[in-house]
Regions:
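Structural signature for solvent-exposed beta-strand/loop edge elements and short helix-capping sites
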Residues: 21-315
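Classical Sec-dependent N-terminal signal peptides that target proteins to the secretory pathway
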Residues: 2-24
């Protein structure tokens, strides 16, 4: 009699999980220990395991709690979220998956790998799965492994599908794993990481110190806005100087309504250029240019070498 009751109980339990796995709100549990509460409306998984949702998300964690009525999944401890369909992986300690809203809230610190190329380290991020957008209002570090570029951003929104990055208070280090690199500071910007184009406001670009053959220099650009696409970078209302930053008033500078670096034509052009010495205007040029970085000798007033950078333009 006891064996018969045990067999009936096992059959009922198996049927429950089979029906649940193939329901409209399918979640398949594969955990070491499971608890079913509130008439089957709450499921708790313990002692490590994996769940797979019907929309292709695989989550591994130490503990799970699923509220079937609210369609909310909680996970804690050594979490890995793998969305194979959309090509991203997230590691964290605490997540809340609001399935009806298609929203995954990652609480605390986390790391994310997108397209096996973009490595995000952030805190309190949100994944909007229906829009494929990653958001965070906390400082975030992004490493673009392909282009060897480091981004540090105070606030961001990243389109996983389009590889479009929007951010505020942005620091960029190009070729970050090399001894010398260029540094960029943008108040806010939008980047297309696919083709390395961007538009930005309130820019401050610090070129590597030895770019003109003198490590004591601090060559830099400032401008109210900048954009870059298809090998052409522009800076609006820009200022250029290579004087040391410790000089409160730079001994010299070039100001222009527009500065254009055209990689295709191998030229750097200035519109309405004003040369200043100790902040005193001394010479004005409606048009002013010098050869680009790939040109060693050419007629012109200046022959600089601009660092090899996908942000400003590759030399």
């Amino acid at each position: 009699m006891l064996n018969r009751l045990l067999i009936i109980f096992i059959v009922i339990l198996n049927n429950f999980f089979l029906n649940y796995a193939y329901s409209d709100d399918q979640i398949n549990f594969d955990v070491s220990q499971i608890e079913v509460l509130e008439g089957g409306n709450k499921i708790i998984g313990k002692k490590r395991g994996t769940i797979t949702t019907n929309d292709g998300v695989v989550i591994s964690a130490d503990n799970f709690e699923y509220d079937k009525i609210k369609n909310i999944l909680k996970a804690k401890g050594n979490i890995t979220v793998n969305d194979e369909a959309n090509n991203y992986i997230i590691n964290s300690e605490n997540i809340l998956y609001l399935r009806d809203q298609e929203k995954i809230q990652i609480k605390g610190k986390s790391s994310s790998l997108i397209f096996s190329n973009y490595n995000f380290k952030s805190e309190d991020i949100v994944i909007l799965r229906d829009k494929l957008i990653l958001e965070s209002n906390k400082p975030t570090t992004i490493i673009d492994k392909k282009n060897q570029t480091l981004y540090e951003i105070d606030k961001l929104s990243f389109s996983i599908k389009d590889e479009i990055l929007k951010g505020e208070k942005i620091f960029i280090n190009t070729k970050f794993n090399q001894p010398f690199s260029d540094n960029y500071f943008f108040k806010n910007a939008i980047f297309n990481l696919k083709d390395q184009s961007y538009i930005a406001k309130d820019i401050d670009i610090n070129l590597k110190k030895d770019i003109f053959g003198n490590k004591k220099n601090d060559p830099r650009f400032k401008g109210i806005s900048s954009s870059s696409k298809n090998g052409v970078t522009t800076i609006d209302k820009g200022i250029f100087t290579s004087c040391k930053k410790s000089d409160k008033c730079p001994p010299w500078s070039v100001q222009a309504e527009k500065i254009t670096y055209d990689q295709n034509k191998k030229k750097v052009l200035y519109d309405s250029a004003l040369i200043k010495v100790y902040d005193i205007p001394v010479m004005y040029f409606p048009k002013f240019f010098h050869p680009g970085p790939t040109v060693k000798r050419q007629s012109g007033l200046l022959v600089p070498h601009i660092n090899n950078s996908n942000i400003l333009g590759s030399s």
